[in-house]
Structure formats: C-alpha cells, structure tokens
C-alpha cells in the first residue's frame, strides 16, 4: 500500500485512433447530399431546356430564303451537269461517230427528263406514278361517303372516253363482268335504275322534239302571213299613188 502511495499513478495515453466520435462523418454526408441536390438541379435544368427547344415552333422560311435555296440548288445542279458533260466529252474521244450520235441522243433524253422533273417540282405537279398513288388506286372505300367519292372519280375517269365508238361495248362488257357475282335481286335493282334512267331520257327527248316542232311551225306560219301581206302591198300599192296624182 505504501508502495502505491509512493508511486505516482499516471494513466496511459489513449491512442487517437482508438477514439470514435459518434458524430464523426455527419458533415461529410451533408456535403454528399448537397452535391446530389446540385446534380438533380442540373438535370432538371437540362430537361427544361430540351423541352423548351422541342416546344418552340419551327420558324417558317421566308420567300427570300426559299428563293436563295432554289438558286443554290440550281447552281449545284449546273455545276454537276458541267462536270458530267466534261467527263462525257473525254469519253467521246474513244467512240466512233455512230456511237457518239447515239450517246448524244441518250444524253439529250436524260437532260429533257431532268428538266421536266425540275419544272414539275417547281410548279408543284406530281408525276403520273404519284398521281396514281393519290387517286383511285390508293382509295379503299368502306363508308357510304367514301364510295360516293370513289364513284365521282371513277365516272370522271371513264366519261373522258364516251365519244369513242368502243365506249358502249366496253360498258356492256364491264357491267356484265361486275354483275356476274351479284344476286338476282341486286341485278334487278340495277336494271330498274337503268330503266328509270331510260324513261327519263326518252321523256326529255320527246319534249325537246315537240318544242322544236312548235317553234318551227310558228316560224312557217308567220312567214306565210308576211308573204301574203307583202304580195298584197306589191299588187295594190300603186293604186294609192295613182289616186294622189289624180287629185
């Protein structure tokens, strides 16, 4: 006991590594969280910028810009043609006169077709293939309105040939082929429609003939009356003059 009193007790130092602070690392978490918030805000800003760009309507080109683009396109086309012409002229040196003539005609045809396409594009006219895709060939009618529109286009297309001598035989053959698969009742309806149309046309034709005859008769009657009057004036017209001389 005395020995303990004589000796001074000094507690050993606790290593710094062994001390654990329960609040240690809290500040670091806050820093990480703040950096995440910053990243989220940046992403939101980028998304908003993209949405704004997408929502912004595209500006329509002015007439000046359109003309400028067409002029540039024309210059590029002329440059391409000049280069192609130069290349072909170099190739012509190796051809015979007959081959040169045939090649010249071929190139002329290509140029004409190219010019035609440019003109059609300028005036907004489509090719025949495009017209067929947007006309009867492209239509698949299913409703009453669609069939009505289809009928108008078909009639407009067919009636262009009604003055041709083969038009009536064509209609007969076409109607026969169309009606082959129909029921008798449906064919009867079509026949009734044609009969009604025939009756209306006959009535109109008779009325037109009757009106023409009445007009012609009135003209002839009026002409006869005028003829008799002129004849009387010619026969007795001098009597009045003689009476005046006598007086």
Swiss-Prot record:
<keyword id="KW-0175">Coiled coil</keyword>
<dbReference type="InterPro" id="IPR023194">
    <property type="entry name" value="eIF3-like_dom_sf"/>
</dbReference>
<dbReference type="Pfam" id="PF08597">
    <property type="entry name" value="eIF3_subunit"/>
</dbReference>
<dbReference type="GO" id="GO:0003743">
    <property type="term" value="F:translation initiation factor activity"/>
</dbReference>
<comment type="function">
    <text>Component of the eukaryotic translation initiation factor 3 (eIF-3) complex, which is involved in protein synthesis of a specialized repertoire of mRNAs and, together with other initiation factors, stimulates binding of mRNA and methionyl-tRNAi to the 40S ribosome. The eIF-3 complex specifically targets and initiates translation of a subset of mRNAs involved in cell proliferation.</text>
</comment>
<feature type="compositionally biased region" description="Acidic residues">
    <location>
        <begin position="24"/>
        <end position="45"/>
    </location>
</feature>
<dbReference type="GO" id="GO:0001732">
    <property type="term" value="P:formation of cytoplasmic translation initiation complex"/>
</dbReference>
<keyword id="KW-0963">Cytoplasm</keyword>
<dbReference type="InterPro" id="IPR013906">
    <property type="entry name" value="eIF3j"/>
</dbReference>
<comment type="subunit">
    <text>Component of the eukaryotic translation initiation factor 3 (eIF-3) complex.</text>
</comment>
<feature type="coiled-coil region">
    <location>
        <begin position="43"/>
        <end position="108"/>
    </location>
</feature>
<feature type="region of interest" description="Disordered">
    <location>
        <begin position="77"/>
        <end position="101"/>
    </location>
</feature>
<protein>
    <recommendedName>
        <fullName>Eukaryotic translation initiation factor 3 subunit J</fullName>
    </recommendedName>
</protein>
<dbReference type="GO" id="GO:0016282">
    <property type="term" value="C:eukaryotic 43S preinitiation complex"/>
</dbReference>
<keyword id="KW-0648">Protein biosynthesis</keyword>
<feature type="region of interest" description="Disordered">
    <location>
        <begin position="1"/>
        <end position="64"/>
    </location>
</feature>
<dbReference type="GO" id="GO:0005852">
    <property type="term" value="C:eukaryotic translation initiation factor 3 complex"/>
</dbReference>
<keyword id="KW-0396">Initiation factor</keyword>
<comment type="similarity">
    <text>Belongs to the eIF-3 subunit J family.</text>
</comment>
<dbReference type="GO" id="GO:0033290">
    <property type="term" value="C:eukaryotic 48S preinitiation complex"/>
</dbReference>
């Amino acid at each position: 006991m005395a020995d303990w009193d004589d000796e001074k007790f000094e507690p050993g130092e606790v290593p710094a590594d062994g001390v654990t602070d329960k609040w240690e690392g809290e500040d670091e978490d806050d820093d990480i969280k703040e950096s995440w918030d910053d990243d989220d805000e940046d992403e939101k800003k980028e998304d908003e910028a993209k949405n704004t760009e997408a929502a912004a309507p595209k500006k329509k080109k002015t007439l000046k810009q359109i003309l400028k683009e067409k002029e540039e396109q024309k210059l590029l086309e002329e440059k391409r043609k000049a280069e192609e012409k130069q290349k072909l002229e170099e190739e012509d040196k190796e051809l015979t006169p007959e081959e040169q003539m045939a090649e010249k005609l071929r190139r002329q045809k290509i140029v004409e077709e190219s010019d035609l396409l440019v003109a059609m594009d300028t005036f907004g006219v489509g090719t025949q293939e495009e017209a067929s895709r947007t006309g009867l060939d492209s239509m698949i009618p299913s409703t009453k309105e669609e069939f009505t529109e289809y009928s108008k286009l078909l009639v407009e297309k067919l009636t262009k040939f009604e003055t041709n001598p083969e038009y009536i035989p064509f209609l007969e053959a076409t109607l026969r082929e169309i009606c082959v698969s129909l029921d008798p009742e449906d064919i009867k309806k079509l026949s009734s429609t044609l009969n009604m149309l025939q009756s209306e046309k006959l009535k109109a034709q008779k009325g037109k003939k009757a009106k023409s005859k009445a007009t012609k008769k009135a003209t002839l009657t009026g002409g006869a009356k005028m003829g008799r009057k002129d004849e009387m004036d010619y026969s007795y017209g001098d009597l009045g003059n003689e009476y005046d001389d006598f007086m």
